[in-house]
Amino acid sequence: MNIIDELAWRDAINQQTNEEGLRELTENTSISLYCGVDPTGDSMHIGHLIPFMMMKRFQLAGHHPYILIGGGTGTIGDPSGRTTERVLQTMEAVQHNVDSLSNQMKKLFGKDAEVTMVNNYDWLSELSLLDFLRDYGKNFNVNTMLAKDIVASRLESGISFTEFTYQILQSIDFYTLHKKHNIQLQIGGADQWGNITAGLDLIRKKEGPEAKVFGLTIPLMLKADGTKFGKTAGGAIWLDPKKTSPFEFYQFWLNQDDRDVIKYLKFFTFLDKEEIDALAEKVEKEPGKREAQRRLAEEVTRFVHDDAALEEAQKISEALFSGNIKDLTIEEIEQGLEHVPTVEITKDAKNIVDWLVDTEIEPSKRQAREDVSGGAISINGDRVTDLDFAVDPTQHFDGKFVVVRKGKKNYFLAKVMD
């Protein structure tokens, strides 16, 4: 299957220029293509995966991806999708973010020979104002720039000249990469269409209308309920394991809605049509088993992290679901219970009823007695029904904390104060 046809089957194309021309080009030759990301932070989140999954598919189809880290444009800020001006970062912060994102990209795309990393600071920093105006500014019509959505949406609230010129800088990127590396395709999110087409126009003005260059954007990813994909009540889901643990990352995908899971399997995994169709049938006939969600979580966690991180996430998930947490390490407990209600306690042993009330896990002694007697309370993986039981924080997990399970799903973490 041609890469363009595969992307169409996966519903991964929003807009593209000259579909037949791009299909013919990718059918007969190996092309170079690029996608850019500005270093606004020191980690990508799962929203960034959307265009880079497409880049990975091109790579697997025998094409060569170039990843542009915007060390130059990152000092200015992309107005796309913004209603307000970005706060400018220091050069030191930008460079730190460039280094961090470069490392993440190499992990996703593999060996240096299979992907080329570039930084637009290398050429934009050498561009003088006079050269910018004479060699590039002359090729841009202000009326055309004002009509593009990325600018038009900001005219009422106001846009600085700095952000107004962003599309020129991104166009210079495309032109520079085309001239130096024969890059013929730029990929971006749906909000990048205006910037991408501006780059195509610049190349054709500089190189001639016969230049074989193309643009392709990915659809805006929305959940079945109409809300934006990638956000949770706790904020963004990051690719950096220090910001979002592999367990939390795994759980995010595991908890996807039946209405969304097949769409995400198409987009975020490398499973083929036969495998995805089989999982779609299971969603239809046996939704309670959630096999599609489990496969989605496995595939994406393995791709972003690795097999070891996936196995750890699965181990924690199974332990917390079953309540058998005794075999978990301290680090695994902390990872799995990072977002549960947490209280501070002393090392002193105390009667379970009093202890549950003191930690505010139970609202009253009456409720505490009822839950303990009814078998609803587990301490460090053991169900406790004895009202005379003494909670001793020093007995498990090196005396660092006590894990409480109330009912089947509610966990609490009581940390021992130093």
Swiss-Prot record:
Chain positions recorded as L-tyrosine binding sites: 34, 166, 170
GO BP: any one term: tyrosyl-tRNA aminoacylation
CDD domains registered for this protein in UniProt: S4 (cd00165), TyrRS_core (cd00805)
GO molecular function: ATP binding; RNA binding; tyrosine-tRNA ligase activity
Span(s) of short sequence motif 'HIGH' region: 39-48
GO CC, alphabetical: cytosol
Glycoprotein as UniProt keyword: no
Key word Cytoplasm present: yes
Signal peptide coordinates: none
EC category name: ligase
Domain S4 RNA-binding: 350-416
Cross-referenced PROSITE patterns: AA_TRNA_LIGASE_I, S4
Motif ('KMSKS' region): 228-232
Subcellular locations according to the entry: Cytoplasm
EC identifiers of the protein: 6.1.1.1
InterPro entries documented for this protein: aa-tRNA-synth_I_CS (IPR001412), aa-tRNA-synth_Ic (IPR002305), Rossmann-like_a/b/a_fold (IPR014729), S4_RNA-bd_sf (IPR036986), SYY-like_C (IPR054608), Tyr-tRNA-ligase (IPR002307), Tyr-tRNA-ligase_bac-type (IPR024088), Tyr-tRNA-ligase_bac_1 (IPR024107)
Key words of the record: Aminoacyl-tRNA synthetase, ATP-binding, Cytoplasm, Ligase, Nucleotide-binding, Protein biosynthesis, RNA-binding
Catalyzed reactions: tRNA(Tyr) + L-tyrosine + ATP = L-tyrosyl-tRNA(Tyr) + AMP + diphosphate + H(+)
Residues bound to ATP: 231
Self-association and partners: Homodimer.
Family assignment from sequence similarity: Belongs to the class-I aminoacyl-tRNA synthetase family. TyrS type 1 subfamily.
Function: Catalyzes the attachment of tyrosine to tRNA(Tyr) in a two-step reaction: tyrosine is first activated by ATP to form Tyr-AMP and then transferred to the acceptor end of tRNA(Tyr).
Protein name: Tyrosine--tRNA ligase 1
Source organism (scientific name): Enterococcus faecalis (strain ATCC 700802 / V583)
